[in-house]
Amino acid sequence: MKICIFGAGAIGGHLAPRLQNAGADVSVVARGEHLAAIQKDGLTLELPDRVLNARVKASEDPGELGKQDAVIVAVKAPALPDVAARIAPLLRSDTPVVFAMNGIPWWYFHANGGPFDGRRLPLLDPDDALWHAIGPQRSLGGVVYSSNTVVRPGVV
């Protein structure tokens, strides 16, 4: 299964080595010194009982990573407009997108059946960029139950 982690910081950097260790074909969208370190030495996850190193394909350009079976977005909320603008090359018509991040999801009221059914949240998706680029029908929320930090570029 091809899985791309969009945002290889503390959360994405924790998930990528674990998914690769489980047999997934993992790639990451990263930037700066973190990207350079991942491209050179792989992405290292330091756990209390072991160290996992994932030699993942890493790029700042999602177009270099190809279509994916699943995408996990693990960025901070202010980076979501950038995700909306750049995620298209990763998506097939049926690619699910999991949001592993803090806060209320931008698609929260989509098809919930309650009094706010279908209501959009302009503070979270001001120009409907995520709504149009990804769509609520393929969006999933995720919970990451671990404490993570980037120790140094390429190491979580």
Regions found by a protein language model. Give the residues of each.
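Short, hinge-like loop/turn segments at secondary-structure boundaries
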Residues: 44-47, 114-117, 156
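Rossmann-like NAD(P)(H) cofactor-binding subdomain of soluble oxidoreductases
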Residues: 52-55, 59-152
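A contiguous, well-structured "functional interface" segment within a domain
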Residues: 2-6, 14-18, 141-156
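NAD(P)+-binding Rossmann beta1-loop-alpha1 motif at the extreme N-terminus of oxidoreductases
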Residues: 1-47
